[in-house]
Amino acid sequence: MKIEDIKFKAKRLDNKEWVEGSFVVMNIAALSKTTIGIVAAGGATLHEVDPSTVCQFTGLTDYDGKDLYEGDIISFSDSYNQVVWEDDLCAFVLVGVESHSYYVHCDILKNCPFYIVGNKIDKEK
């Protein structure tokens, strides 16, 4: 993954919609906010987001070309799996969301079709 591919998504505080972009934490005295910044040709736009919803892009896309983020739930190999960051492996892994849990390194998805069917955050809220 290239440095320009590093991006995040999170839910905006004002309208609860997902927004994608660069992750920015502003610690200016009383203005401490967690924001997602969107940089476009016309300039930058910052959106205050819920810090508990921040998810990192994995560098992968599903069969339909949708970006795969941490916390997404995918349909893969006749089962549902959640994308999770595993500190001990320094990698994104898949964890089964059904009765059995297991870990599979996300790199296996590079050669297999999968579909994003939801995400942990929307499922919980």
What does each model-identified segment do?
Residues 1-125:
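Secondary-structure transition motif
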